[in-house]
Amino acid sequence: MIATESNPKAQTAGGKSAEVVVSVRGLTKVFKDFWGRAKARAVDDVDFDVKRGEVFGLLGPNGSGKSTTVKMLLGLLYPTKGHIEVFGQSPRHVQTKARIGYLPEESYLYRYLNSRETLDFFGNLFHLDKNDREKRAEQLLEMVGLNQTLTRTVGEFSKGMQRRIGLAQALINDPDLVILDEPTAGLDPIGCREIKDLIIALAERGKTVILSSHLLSDVEDVCDRVVIYYGGKIQAIGTLRELLSKPDTLRITTPVLPRETMERVLEIIRNDIGNGEVRVDNPTQNLESYFLEVVEKAKKAAQQTSGAQSGARVAEYLRAGVETKPA
């Protein structure tokens, strides 16, 4: 487990603020049946902290307690036991909720509104004035690649396009804490890569991101620290380097070597390690990188598509400044 720093304002080794944004202690959630008998222990005695500017991953298989934890962080569910603080307050506090952006696992959208009307509706819930709503909607729709679909209603969108508009609504209030539950579900590899890049950009701006996912690649690509759930319990927590390092294994990468040179190197290694395993192979490109390369070539050839476009840079109002708003 990673120890929490004694000074809440200190800087971590990676340069990120150690100010604690989310504090969870002894968090437990037991769902009961009609008669009040325990039916399922979804979350069981969980402890963790999330720091300002950190991308914190909740990783685990389906049904491991990730989404239940997220709902308690949002104040949508009461814990059976334990304590949660978000920005030093209860997650049910109105001022706390105003500083949070949330993308649920299934986006709840009004199917007869178009994308601009959808963002205007959610912006109005945060009491943004009309000019701010219009400006932010324009920037967000460009950012998520939906600025060419303004006249289409959300009900006509594919699932991937609905995820994009869902992400835009989660950012309409310029939140200090962004909670994303399976943000890449239904997205094509291009959209997945853009979402990951956006998450990194938000963290660089000083925002805190909690990412709940069962997809290993999502978590591995963007998270500073990860907690792994199974059976409602934390099985492991730490930085990716701490969790993934294999101190008893060494990898050496070289250009292609002549066969004679390779044989000499292998002979030296085998003489040194005895019966230990030695493996020689050629590195391969991962499928995501190859797919993106193919699509990029098609885009450069000016091939047309009627779906979502590639997203643009991070919305201007999300990039300006690094200071979070006061509570």
Feature roles, as predicted:
Residues 82-96:
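Conserved ABC transporter NBD signature motif
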Residues 174:
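Conserved catalytic motifs of ABC-family nucleotide-binding domains
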